[in-house]
Amino acid sequence: MFNQSYLNVYFICGTSNVPSHRTIHEVLEAALKAGITLFQFREKGESALKGNDKLVLAKELQHLCHQYNVPFIVNDDVSLAKEINADGIHVGQDDAKVKEIAQYFTDKIIGLSISDLGEYAKSDLTHVDYIGVGPIYPTPSKHDAHTPVGPEMIATFKEMNPQLPIVAIGGINTSNVAPIVEAGANGISVISAISKSENIEKTVNRFKDFFNN
């Protein structure tokens, strides 16, 4: 069952997003201990794990998340999400259609990326629990990212659909969260702000403070 508070501090990570001196297991566990509210396994890039290696890692990270009662979301990979019985799946505009995914994930969390009004207009939100809006700011984590849309886009979507849970993504760090919260976002999703943080506990707690007031 989806709860929009899951979106508060939503950590996204894959093996290519962690510093060379740390493992993804270490980074994720530090983030879980600090209190992230949702985790998305996003294994992308030239060095991304595939096949059984990806499956084994997904199961290990899922087990870690469940030890801390944090839902485990899979990015894009429908077959992987089904195989490990993930808590949910997040897809982009170019991925499998949400309606088809909903047939397999009737009791799971479904997220959809939307970057502008055009994508919003053509998106089927019937089966979607939340939308990921962005990139809000310029981001180094996604080389194929759209042009930044700013916090204003969140306010626009909230005005159009006040009940739709929204998580902001793209270039977010502890110093630029305030405008996103003011725009009405239910949470923030980050990659490098946590994965490359020198003090993950401090970073996560600063993010949490914006949604605990």
UniProtKB/Swiss-Prot annotation:
Cofactor dependence: Mg(2+)
Keywords assigned: Magnesium, Metal-binding, Thiamine biosynthesis, Transferase
Binding-site residues for 2-[(2R,5Z)-2-carboxy-4-methylthiazol-5(2H)-ylidene]ethyl phosphate, renumbered to this chain: T139, P140, S141, G171, I191, S192
Pathway: Cofactor biosynthesis; thiamine diphosphate biosynthesis; thiamine phosphate from 4-amino-2-methyl-5-diphosphomethylpyrimidine and 4-methyl-5-(2-phosphoethyl)-thiazole: step 1/1
InterPro entries given in the database record: Aldolase_TIM (IPR013785), ThiamineP_synth_sf (IPR036206), ThiamineP_synth_TenI (IPR022998), TMP_synthase (IPR034291)
Annotated Mg(2+) binding sites: D76, D95
Catalytic activity: 2-[(2R,5Z)-2-carboxy-4-methylthiazol-5(2H)-ylidene]ethyl phosphate + 4-amino-2-methyl-5-(diphosphooxymethyl)pyrimidine + 2 H(+) = thiamine phosphate + CO2 + diphosphate; 2-(2-carboxy-4-methylthiazol-5-yl)ethyl phosphate + 4-amino-2-methyl-5-(diphosphooxymethyl)pyrimidine + 2 H(+) = thiamine phosphate + CO2 + diphosphate; 4-methyl-5-(2-phosphooxyethyl)-thiazole + 4-amino-2-methyl-5-(diphosphooxymethyl)pyrimidine + H(+) = thiamine phosphate + diphosphate
GO molecular function terms noted in the UniProt entry: magnesium ion binding; thiamine-phosphate diphosphorylase activity
GO terms for cellular component: cytoplasm
Annotated SUPFAM superfamilies: Thiamin phosphate synthase
Source superkingdom: Bacteria
Binding site for 4-amino-2-methyl-5-(diphosphooxymethyl)pyrimidine: Q40, F41, R42, E43, K44, N75, S113, K142
Classification via CDD domains: TMP_TenI (cd00564)
EC number: 2.5.1.3
Keyword Ligase among UniProt keywords: no
Cited Pfam families: TMP-TENI
EC top class named in words: transferase
NCBIfam families per record: thiE
Function: Condenses 4-methyl-5-(beta-hydroxyethyl)thiazole monophosphate (THZ-P) and 2-methyl-4-amino-5-hydroxymethyl pyrimidine pyrophosphate (HMP-PP) to form thiamine monophosphate (TMP).
Family label: Belongs to the thiamine-phosphate synthase family.
PANTHER family: THIAMINE-PHOSPHATE PYROPHOSPHORYLASE, THIAMINE-PHOSPHATE SYNTHASE
Name of the protein in its database record: Thiamine-phosphate synthase
